[in-house]
Amino acid sequence: MILKSFLLGNLLSLCMKIINSVVVVGLYYGFLTTFSIGPSYLFLLRARVMEEGTEKKVSATTGFITGQLMMFISIYYAPLHLALGRPHTITVLALPYLLFHFFWNNHKHFFDYGSTTRNSMRNLSIQCVFLNNLIFQLFNHFILPSSTLARLVNIYMFRCNNKMLFVTSSFVGWLIGHILFMKWVGLVLFWIRQNHSIKSNVLIRSNKYLVSELRNSMARIFSILLFITCVYYLGRMPAPIVTKKLKETSKTEERGESEEERDVEIETTSETKGTKQEQERSTEEDPSPSLCSEEKEDPDKIDETEEIRVNGKEKTKDEFKETCYKSRPVYENYYLNGNQENSKLEILKDKEDKDLFWFEKPLVTLLFDYKRWNRPLRYIKNDRFENAVRNEMSQYLFYTCKNDGKQRISFTYPPSLSTFLEMIQRKIYLCTKEKLSSEEMYNHWIYTNEQKKNNLRNEFINRIEALDKEFVSLNVLEKITRLCNDETEQECSPKVYDPLLNGPYRGTITNLYSSSIMNETLIEDSIETLCLCINKIHGILLTDYREFEHKINKFDRKSLSRDIGHLSTSIIEFDGESIPSFNFKALSLLTEDGRIDSEDQAKFSKFLVKEISKRVPRWSYKLIDTLEQEERENEEEVAEDHEIRSRKAKRVVIFNDNGQNTDTHTNTSNDDQGNEVALIRYSQQSDFRRDIIKGSMRAQRRKIVTWKLFQANVHSPLFLDRIDKTFFFSFDISGMMKIIFRNWMVKNTELKISDYEEEEKNKKETEKKNEKKREEKTRILIAETWDSILCAQVIRGSMLVIQSIIRKYIVLPSLIIAKNISRMLLFQFPEWSEDLKDWSREIHVKCTYNGVQLSETEFPKNWLIDGIQIKILFPFCLKPWHRSKLGSHHRDPMKNKRKKNDFCFLTVWGMEAELPFGSPRKRLSFFEPICKELEKKIRKVKKNYFIVLKILKERTKLFIKVSKEKKGWVIKRVLFIKRIIKELNKILFGLREVYDSSENKNRKDYIISNQMIHESSIRIRSMDWTNSLLTEKKMKDLTDRTNTIRKKIERIKRDKKKTFLTSEIKISPNERSCDNKKLESPKNIWQILKRRNTRLIRKWNYFIKFLIERIYIDALPYIINIPRIHGRLFLESKKKIMDKSIYNHEKNQEGIDETNKNTTHFISTIKRPLSNNNNKNSKIFCDLSSLSQAYVFYKLSQTQVINKYNLRSVLQYHGASLFPKERIRYFCGTRGIFNSQSKHKRLRNFGMNEWKNWLRDHYQYDLSQIKWSRLVLQKWRNRVNQRRTVQNKDSKKLGSYEKDQLIHYETEHDYEVYSLPSQKENLKKNYRYDLLSYNYIHYENKKGSYIHVSPLQVTKGREIPYNYNIHKPEFFYVLGGIPISDYLGEDYIIDTEENPDRKYFDWIILNFCLRKKLDIEAWTDIDTGDSINKNTKTGTNNYQIIDKIDKKYLFYLTIHQEINPSNQKKNFFDWMGMNEEILNRTISNLELWFFQEFVLLYNAYKIKPWVIPIKLLLLNFNRNKNVSENKNINKKQKNDLWIPFTEKKSIELENRNQEEKETRGQGDLGSDAQNHGNLGYVLSNQQKDVEEDYAGSNIKKRRKKKQCTSNTEAELNFLLKRYLLFQLRWDDPFNQRMINNIKVYCLLLRLINPKEISISSIQSGEMSPDIIQKDLTITELIKKGLLIIEPVRLSIKRDGQFIMYQTISISLVHKNKQQTNGRCREKRYVDKNYFDESIARHEKMVGTGDENHYELLVPENISSPRRRRELRIRICFNSGNKNFVDRNPVFFNENKVKHCGRFLDENKHLDTDKKKLIKLKCFLWPNYQLEDLACMNRYWFNTNNGSRFSMSRIHMYPRLKIR
């Protein structure tokens, strides 16, 4: 076995080695490269497909392989890689060649691709085929982009040692794949050639020679494909766009941001990510410090810049364009060989004029510098401050740096720093220090680290000693020195820009005098020293220039540092803004010996002063977008140009209160803009601007597809699965399923007529709505099309104005003239006055693009750019005549006005439309009334004509009638004569007729009888049960036929008796007749028998059917009911027994409330009548087989501990858990039913340091789970699984217990990493990484990041009153142990884009069964305690059932009142219509009947109403109870108007103090969680005050400290200071009406006589005068419900201070002081000066009344966060001491584990250790993992030398010994 395992292990290791070998990886990579199909394959396939010679195929393959080999070699050989990897290489090489090749192939005389007889390699065509395949193989690929493969190569080349082997094997892999691919292509082509003619298809006719035609047109097809490739590469090329230069920055920006070279996120478009080291060095910057001028230049000059990379950003250098002197433009010549020394600068000394050179860049850099950004692409802005906090892009450059005392390679070294350092080191040989050995460097690092650690320790010890000496705590805490902007107003600068707080932002912000006030003598005195220093610096840095090479020897290098220092001080004396660079070209004035001529000296001094006073272009950190520019134009500030390209929007001015009408084509001046009312209209098209900074190079978004004219979001096709309905899958699946399964659905359903009618009605309404939506979409599409086409608005606006003028002054007057002339010609009176009156009523109102009316004369602002609409009021309609006032028009004018709109919009073609961009409406025709009048006349004439015709017809009818009467009389006479002749014939020939008839009758009788029997026999044979219906039908037919035949026979017999027998008697009176009678009687009997037989056969079928039905109806029910009756009796007897036992059990139960004796049915029932729900004694039929486990354990939990003790041995099981659900086990365990210990229970690890124990025992200290999830870069998922275990070793009554909380992230299957959101504020950065330090206490847990929490709960030997949630239900997100202030902040809402109203309070998860009676208490596993002193428990089990939910009511609960102790029986919560017993309880019992989560949220809401979700707190279906009153807030509501409770916060502004008093008065209500909520409120209140200070200071800056006089402005300012950000929302019922009113009012304010239009607007319903608000203040608007202020959730700043406050506020709770009785509960409200009061509170809670000592729990909190972090790390760095972590032997002695009982409170014998333990200072830290230190190093020491978390710097720390 050992041998086998050994062999198997060797085999596995061998396989792993082979798989991980260089050769296999290279083969894999090469095989991958085969599938990177690019344009080179087109040429190769072309050579294969087209009938060319073998030489061409060989040359194509050779060129193809050679090109690929060059690409593989370029991986290894850096210069070749740099030459081939540049985008300008692709552009220069590919595009001209492609275009040339395209035109060459399309011209028939240029090149012949046919077969040739020349067999020579000198043939031009063969060489071109080779070049085609060689060159095109060097380009990027299509299907698998080369950047992907290049990244794979870079990663592996970095790891791989044998690089050449890797390159070779990858080429071999590619060759194998290529050969296989070409073989496959060859087979396909061979198969095509075999089938010369494809068989004719139905769809394709006459295609016998399709393949040959395809082969002939192959050249054209390939040319088209290559042309597409050209276009593709044009899209990839970095286009030479004229970009915008950097803005000049103001003095304040310069002063405040001298070290502002900070984080700007840049998106790179580099397609080839080559080896970064060579790439960075190949684009070495110009090492010379060039002067950067910011003069306004001519617009025809292209402002081209080159990049300087400083700290991860691309900076710009504008070449200095000097105006006073001769220009010496600089050309940069890059030698693309990767060597730094070869990058040279050449100065071309041309004496020509400067204007001849319109650029100062080489052509390649100008056109193809793909890294050429003038400014960053993105601008991330902090909402809380005006200035931006930037985020730097990580860069990778390998360079050696000193790290932890050793020289190591860093791959995140700033490239600009390394470049500058190498330049200095190369030029200054004497400045290089002696290199210390690695051991000396390491010892020096250890020494300095120990010194710093000791200093920190001493300071820390001194502070602790001061605490022991009972100093005031505020004096002991480390103060933070802040920088003040204004000492008088005591305004501190924002934390982001405070140099005393943040190292990278440290800078001198001193108010130096400006250069204009400076003394000129000082300037002149220091000019000479300046020149010398400048000369030296430029001589050092610019020795590559031939002009200055001879000056190197003149420098005294020892005095260099002194001179540079003098230089910097002298420059600062000149100008405190910045240190400018100097133009090296000015130094050409210096002579050989360094002296300066007098003339040149004067010029040079002027030049220097001029250049020194210039501002150096830097990153503008105060960029504004279009909206901010518009806002600043309205204020009293100088309007700056916007720099950020925001979404396309238009500022639509709807009202301008300038007191007079402006001119037609003039815009309003700036003075009037302050009184404008404007709306912002966003263009409804894709936002391609995406807040990109002007002048930044756009990334070529080649993966974005736009397939519609109007597309809401532009995105890549990769995200098609995220879209609800894509372009390709836009069909309705449910609709298709309905169509497919319609037959199945219809079979078992009966449609009623009423349902059908209702369906039809709904269908029509839906169609109408859809039609309206379609029309609206069409209108929007037309509007956006006009808006998006270039110059379309100018054309459209001009055409509209022209059409308006033509209509008003040309067309309509000419129509009036023509009409009246024609009336005069027709001898009628003209109607000049009436027509002209109607014409003058027509008003052409100019409107904005959206249709907001302005006035007749005033055009909208920028109407040619933004667009215009022309609205025609009372449009003129030409009438052929005017009726008098007594006509029908006068009778109902309102009816006519309602039917006909009295306005329309003018279209471009002069038509009328109902809505802007709507379809043209039909005009009333001029000739239609005329035609109607003519029709009336014609009808009248016709009427008279028809009267004449009628008279003539009547005369004609009379004549015809008379003639008919005469004719009838003649006919009657003739018929009478004929009848007489017929009677005579009958008498003569009677006997013969009788004899013939008798014979015929007998024959007929025989035939009919035979036929009858034959038919009946067929019917009998065909009877069958299967087709009984058919048989019955046939039998019925047979019966009818038989009856008919019988009647015929009888009638024949009667005829015989009448005729035949009488004639027989008469003719021969003898005995023949008697014989005949005897023969007749047996025949009659036989016929009777036949008849009976037939009847029996007919009735047999009915008889059998009837018999079977009787058996089925009577017998079967008796058989079936026998077992049913017995089963019912059995079940009822069982139910009686069970009910009896349950009743007895409940009766014996101790402490039950007398009012609740009814049985709660947990038995799941099949059918339950709703009428029995309120009947306590009703017997409900239940199926006991489904008795739920929850009911059993609920009943067990109701019994006492003593009674349950015997069950523990049964229920305690040390194997696998018996319970299917963990919840039930924990529920039973916490109630003491049994010890829920199992063998897999996690035992408490007492081997941890004291710090971790402390944190785990104080659940209040836990931060929000969302914060933890952000820190570990995992998205907070839907569920939080909570686990709690209970230990009960010593006491039976569970006097104390430990809860072990495992809040487990579901991370094993969910690796969807939530990247840190774009909160780029430096505010939060410090805070986040303060939290990061506490994250590492959980490093031992391997399965994921979760938190162990042991909340402390102590009782005095009583039953546990579960005021604190022992087990939170899984549907709820708020964790009881976490302060509510931490949880509900908007800052932590991650999934806001999915559901903005969710805020982790999603009620979709709650599945309430509304038609069942639920015991919510047991369903949520929350036990309630009513009175702890009585030691009783109450359960509230009576809940009303909601039979029907009225869908018309909103599912909202509006909380409009505060809890008032004097009025506790108000209708506060009506949750799901609970019964009034609950509603009328006292408020102190609120948490006892309600879910404690809701109470927790409500308590938080009382204190901070802005943290609750916007819409759904609870479901409420009773609208009448929503209207509530409050003693403090007298707010009245109208009918359907309710105000969201977020608005309540704004109403609280008036009576905030009174509410807080009320909140403090609710002592009875607070559970532990509530108190933590109050605590969080206090702390966040303090933080909020700080936020308000910042907000207020910013508002003052923004508004220039204007004095607000009016009431509304004062209130608005107050709101702004309070909230900083807010939204104004009108309630829904008023939205459209308000907008219509605004439109009409804006028009009325401009009209001279508005009475007519206002009346017509009210009549037409466009304006509603009942809701016009006049002179209402903001609070009145809020009270009336018209204005709802909903604060945008401010980002909560939580830095080290906040954590310190939060930590200090937590106390060690002694077991005798943690009283759960409400009377003994301490009030946890803390005032503003909460430091001293909180410590006093800790005295009360920790110590007894006699003791004065207390402690701050974690004494490190007296230090600032930065100092404590530094000390913690330096202790970890202590490499000299083997005992790295100070440990307390008390806690790490296994025999003294019981001393941890201070946290667990398990033992009563720990009182003696109390003083000792309290005096003990908790200062123990875990052994941090190496990766943690690597991640935190930058932020703990404020080092700024790498990326954030994208790639952590690996620190090789000395190994820490772990016990």
Swiss-Prot record:
The chain crosses the membrane at residues 18-38, 64-84, 87-107, 124-144, 172-192, 221-241. It is found in: Plastid, Chloroplast inner membrane. Residues 256-268, 295-306 have a biased composition (Acidic residues). Its main location: plastid. One of its GO terms (cellular component) is chloroplast inner membrane. Pfam families: Ycf1. GO terms for biological process: protein transport. Part of the Tic complex. Involved in protein precursor import into chloroplasts. May be part of an intermediate translocation complex acting as a protein-conducting channel at the inner envelope. PANTHER family: PROTEIN TIC 214, PROTEIN TIC 214-RELATED. There is a partial copy of the N-terminus (positions 1-399) of ycf1 in the inverted repeat (ABQ45296). This is Protein TIC 214. It comes from Buxus microphylla (Littleleaf boxwood). The lineage of its organism: Eukaryota, Viridiplantae, Streptophyta, Embryophyta, Tracheophyta. The gene is TIC214.
